[in-house]
Amino acid sequence: MDIKRTILIVALAIVTYVGVLKWNQDYGQAAMPTQNVAASTTAPGIPDTAAGTNGSASADVPSANATANTAAAPLETPAVASKDLIHVKTDVLDLAIDPVGGDVVQLRLPLYPRRQDRPDVPFQLFDNGGERTFLAQSGLTGTNGPDARAAGRPVYTSTQKTYQLADGQDTMVVDLKFSENGVNYIKRFTFKRGLYDLVMTYVVDNQSAQPWSGNLFAQLKRDASSDPSSTTATGTATYLGAALWTAAEPYKKVSMKDIDKGQVKETVQGGWVAWLQHYFVTAWIPDHNATNAVQTRKDSQGNYIIGFTSPTLSVAPGAQGETSATLYAGPKSQAVLKELSPGLELTVDYGFLWFIAQPIFWLLQHIHAILGNWGWSIIVLTMLIKGLFFPLSAASYKSMARMRAVAPKLALLKEQHGDDRQKMSQAMMELYKKEKINPLGGCLPILVQMPVFLSLYWVLLESVEMRQAPWILWITDLSIKDPFFILPIIMGATMFIQQRLNPTPPDPMQAKVMKMMPIIFTFFFLWFPAGLVLYWVVNNTLSIAQQAYITRKIEAATKKAAV
């Protein structure tokens, strides 16, 4: 029985690890070279088929909507020097807006340092041509949209070049203005204290003699560079790619490979489009009541684009009209994302066991609210899970204890039957039946617990709360490997102790393989996040205590019965 249990554990570990690696090949970081593209002032959308056309609109501007026949033709407009950018700073966002088109081309997160040893250097989410190309674009296209005009994208003006949310100020509005042909445009950004989402609103004041019509578009544009927020070195990188919402599929991934194969087009009521990376997400969220055309594409420079175009906005002469969308750029906070739009919280990707992982994270959060330390919270959570599964674990340990008790009898059977495996198997089954031992008794409890353990793995790997979270002493970041490999070595030691408590396999080859397992697993765990290794150490330690207690209890009962 113990041999089967051992083989099952090893097989599950190997299959799980290989499965994770395969999942990352399909949905993880793209193994592509970084595209160091120069700063672009173009807006989102249609294919670059007319990229050389004279007197045409920007190459990135999409058609008005899925059914419109007024698609803009491309024109590359000159890049704007960084000195011309409009800088905006709140308590949680530090960003730059390009006056050409009004795109958000740089964005940093002051509360999230890029590295723990450099708390003064914030993590940079958007970057237009520095280390990578990643920006949020938006504009007005369609019949009269200024972003679809032959002269190129509009150049906005602002009253200031720098805006900062003052102490005691909860809301800040940044207005960019542009006028043409009797129509006055305001591109308004509204920021609020403590929020990573901002509202982008277009105000169209039509003072011309003609009716005005246009469509709002918004998109995220990114090159193929690797994930700058990824910290694992085990091959278990989380998903890097696009995602969107549909009524049939509230969380639909669109990987770079999917975009390489061709455009994805959807028509949705409300919805959202997003770009995901480890710990952080950026998303455009349109009007929930509007029917929006969502599409993805890859431009001629190798950039990946996902965006939407809203229904036509019509403004009569002498009237005003408004259209808006929300941009989120920040950490994967489930509570915040759920409030912004249905399904957006699923971008915290716990994999196919998300329905188990979410309650585990909820419990972990509540424990942290009491203890204030994520390391101790992991320990308490592990104890609670171990206690919950104690009846199942006890059944497994009892089965192993009985196997340990009959080990001398198994050795005697081996001497009697030698290399005759068939007779040996028959004799073993008769012995199990006589001693009332279930050969699968140690395996089934493990199978039941595996989904919970895998879910906890993804919770610890995916949750932004673990990023740069300290525990004690040398563990200053639970999301990266133990810098001195102390926890993995302790984990290997606990596996060795567990092995000593188990009955020795009758097959010498199996016994040799089992002796190697602590060394093999220690090697694997050297590069695992410290938070995950901490969980495994605590889990193994509790298992040793439970197993030792039950084994002593059964052995004492066996000796008493023998007397």
From Swiss-Prot:
The keyword Cell membrane applies. Keywords: Cell inner membrane, Cell membrane, Chaperone, Membrane, Protein transport, Transmembrane, Transmembrane helix, Transport. Signal peptide: none annotated. CDD domains: 5TM_YidC_Alb3, EcYidC-like_peri. Residues 43-62 are annotated as: Disordered. Coiled coil: none annotated. GO terms for cellular component: plasma membrane. Pfam families: 60KD_IMP, YidC_periplas. It is found in: Cell inner membrane. One of its GO terms (molecular function) is membrane insertase activity. It is a multi-pass membrane protein. InterPro entries: Membr_insert_YidC, Membr_insert_YidC_N, YidC/ALB3/OXA1/COX18, YidC/Oxa/ALB_C, YidC_ALB_C, YidC_periplasmic_sf. Disulfide bonds: none annotated. The chain crosses the membrane at residues 1-21, 344-364, 370-390, 440-460, 471-491, 518-538. PANTHER family: CYTOCHROME C OXIDASE ASSEMBLY PROTEIN COX18, MITOCHONDRIAL (PTHR12428:SF65), OXA1 (PTHR12428). Required for the insertion and/or proper folding and/or complex formation of integral membrane proteins into the membrane. Involved in integration of membrane proteins that insert both dependently and independently of the Sec translocase complex, as well as at least some lipoproteins. Aids folding of multispanning membrane proteins. Belongs to the OXA1/ALB3/YidC family. Type 1 subfamily. Interacts with the Sec translocase complex via SecD. Specifically interacts with transmembrane segments of nascent integral membrane proteins during membrane integration. NCBIfam families: PRK01318.1-3, PRK01318.1-4, yidC_nterm, yidC_oxa1_cterm. This is Membrane protein insertase YidC. It comes from Pseudomonas syringae pv. syringae (strain B728a).
